[in-house]
């Protein structure tokens, strides 16, 4: 069996889903009293009169085959009662009775009837007359297909079923099918391991689904069973449960999620067919986004955001491959689409492709969510905080609480852009109170004094400030302009250590050292470097400064700091009157 055929056993077809949603009526067996009397001799007559005659058995087989074909034709026309009459005539031949029982069970399922007794009868036939039915591979294959028909796989629909559709699913029907699994578990106990594993895993999955539909917490024992049964189906449902918990509660058990993602990655690597199933790959890429977003092991935030955007784009493209209205209703479609746009805004990189230029998003340009996201994107470009607030309020119906962190970062970045690109180049002096008013709306987007001072200081530290400034914290003013770009002077060094005026004068001539601590020239921060490249850059800078110091026999930073550390608290107190604030 190919990988595609093998995985097909795990996916629910439309026919399976429709039969799953049918109501269960009753377990009354059909009335056989009106069976049509056939003029030919019945199988029982053959069995009683022909004995061991080979010709008689061949005739029985041929007659039963004819009855089976007739019943199958009636079943294909949805004439289930008539079909059942013909199938019931095939008792005399074990192989044709086995086939007939399968068709009767399928007919009962189509009519919403219980199949408990028919199942027991079929498995009793298999246990007593297995050799007369056929090879084990044929029997086990038939049983496997029948199991998937009676208790279809619900796994792929756990995350991809809208809440309204979930509420329409009859939980009692699901519980009835779970009871079939109890019968199947006993019946396949003596069969091959594949069938036993299939029934065991299916029981766990149905148990999870029942708790999900009831909005109940999944028992710890059930989750442990999922982890213990290493299987594509169990890992896929675990992946979906992690995603669902994150979306609903903003909770991620990162260590467990990383393990499940790694296992799913191995399944996809080892099976080309599995790696091409969009329902699987879309959840996988979204889960990889979660591991990146929630991980704290990031030295380069831009690199992390770029990877997040890539995973969400892959997720959205896989969802688009599902196609049709089903895709439009998927929960992940909305979240991945918003995540792509949000990550793009946070990257703040004009060289990257605008998300709305993607073909998969272009086809949805009339969608309400896409229209809102385009408005949000334009407000962000215009640095219009009031319009941005209105867009975010309209988006509240679409996103889950976990997006709040992203949105807070987007608002902060928009405020920073407006400060340095609109306000600072325009004003030479502005009161802090007026500046705060320009960076807030008074409703959901706020800016207090501490936040503003933090923004100003961080902008200098991160080299995102486009204009030099000076703070007057006595009068609460901020001054912008190139004139506030001044080097450190020797008398200002005296403020730090009044006893080291001579040493300060020596150091002030060492502009290499001043450049290294960002006091003389404009701060220079290496952009888009990995952690290793950044450390190499810093090492090279230190070597250059050390060699220059040795060549001129001038004091180094280390010697200055060592001397500075010998100042006593009393010495500093005596000279406290000379302390003043710097730019």
Curated annotation (Swiss-Prot):
Localisation per UniProt entry: Cytoplasm; Nucleus
Acidic residues biased stretches: 1-35
Sequence ranges assigned to domain PCI in this UniProt record: 297-485
Keyword Nucleus among UniProt keywords: yes
Main location per the UniProt record: cytoplasm
Span list, region Disordered: 1-55
Gene Ontology cellular component terms for the protein in this record: COP9 signalosome; cytoplasm
Domain of life from the UniProt record: Eukaryota
Keywords: Cytoplasm, Nucleus, Signalosome
InterPro entries: PCI_dom
Subunit structure: Component of a COP9 signalosome-like (CSN) complex.
Function: Component of the COP9 signalosome (CSN) complex that acts as an regulator of the ubiquitin (Ubl) conjugation pathway by mediating the deneddylation of the cullin subunit of SCF-type E3 ubiquitin-protein ligase complexes. The CSN complex is involved in the regulation of the mating pheromone response.
Protein name, UniProt field: COP9 signalosome complex subunit 10
Gene designation: RRI2
């Amino acid at each position: 069996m190919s990988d595609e055929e093998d995985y097909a056993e795990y996916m629910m077809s439309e026919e399976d889903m429709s039969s799953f949603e049918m109501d269960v009526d009753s377990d009354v067996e059909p009335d056989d009293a009106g069976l049509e009397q056939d003029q030919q001799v019945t199988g029982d007559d053959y069995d009683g009169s022909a004995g061991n005659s080979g010709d008689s058995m061949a005739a029985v087989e041929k007659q039963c085959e004819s009855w089976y074909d007739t019943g199958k034709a009636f079943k294909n026309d949805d004439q289930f009662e008539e079909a059942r009459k013909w199938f019931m005539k095939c008792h005399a031949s074990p192989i044709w009775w086995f086939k007939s029982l399968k068709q009767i069970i399928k007919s009962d399922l189509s009519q919403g009837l219980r199949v408990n007794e028919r199942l027991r009868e079929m498995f009793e036939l298999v246990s007593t007359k297995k050799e007369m039915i056929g090879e084990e591979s044929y029997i086990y294959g038939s049983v496997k297909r029948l199991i998937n028909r009676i208790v279809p796989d619900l796994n792929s629909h756990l995350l991809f079923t809208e809440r309204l559709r979930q509420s329409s699913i009859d939980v009692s029907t699901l519980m009835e099918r779970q009871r079939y699994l109890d019968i199947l578990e006993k019946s396949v106990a003596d069969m091959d391991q594949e069938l036993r594993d299939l029934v065991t895993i299916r029981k766990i999955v149905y148990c999870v689904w029942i708790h999900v539909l009831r909005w109940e917490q999944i028992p710890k024992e059930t989750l442990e069973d999922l982890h213990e049964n290493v299987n594509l189906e169990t890992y896929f449902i675990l992946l979906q449960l992690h995603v669902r918990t994150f979306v609903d509660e903003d909770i991620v058990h990162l260590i467990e999620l990383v393990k499940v993602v790694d296992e799913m990655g191995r399944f996809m690597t080892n099976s080309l067919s599995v790696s091409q199933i969009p329902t699987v790959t879309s959840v996988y890429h979204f889960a990889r986004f979660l591991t990146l977003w929630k991980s704290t092991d990031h030295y380069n935030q831009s690199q992390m955001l770029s990877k997040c955007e890539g995973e969400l784009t892959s997720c959205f493209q896989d969802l688009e491959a599902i196609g049709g209205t089903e895709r439009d209703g998927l929960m992940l479609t909305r979240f991945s689409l918003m995540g792509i746009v949000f990550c793009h805004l946070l990257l703040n990189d004009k060289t990257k492709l605008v998300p709305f230029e993607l073909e998969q998003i272009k086809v949805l340009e009339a969608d309400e969510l896409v229209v809102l996201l385009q408005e949000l994107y334009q407000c962000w470009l215009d640095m219009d905080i009031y319009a941005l607030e209105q867009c975010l309020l309209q988006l509240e119906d679409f996103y889950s609480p976990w997006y709040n962190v992203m949105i807070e970062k987007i608002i902060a970045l928009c405020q920073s852009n407006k400060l340095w690109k609109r306000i600072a180049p325009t004003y030479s002096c502005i009161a802090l109170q007026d500046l705060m008013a320009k960076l807030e709306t008074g409703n959901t987007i706020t800016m207090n004094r501490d936040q503003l001072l933090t923004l100003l200081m961080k902008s200098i530290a991160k080299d995102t400030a486009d204009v030099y400034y000076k703070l007057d914290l006595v009068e609460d003013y901020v001054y912008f302009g190139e004139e506030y770009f001044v080097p450190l002077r020797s008398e200002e060094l005296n403020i730090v250590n009044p006893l080291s005026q001579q040493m300060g004068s020596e150091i002030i001539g060492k502009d290499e050292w001043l450049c290294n601590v960002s006091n003389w020239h404009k701060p220079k921060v290496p952009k888009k470097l990995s952690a290793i490249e950044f450390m190499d850059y810093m090492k090279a800078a230190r070597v250059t400064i050390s060699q220059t110091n040795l060549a001129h026999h001038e004091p180094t930073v280390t010697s200055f700091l060592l001397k500075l550390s010998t100042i006593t608290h009393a010495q500093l107190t005596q000279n406290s009157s000379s302390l003043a604030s710097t730019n």
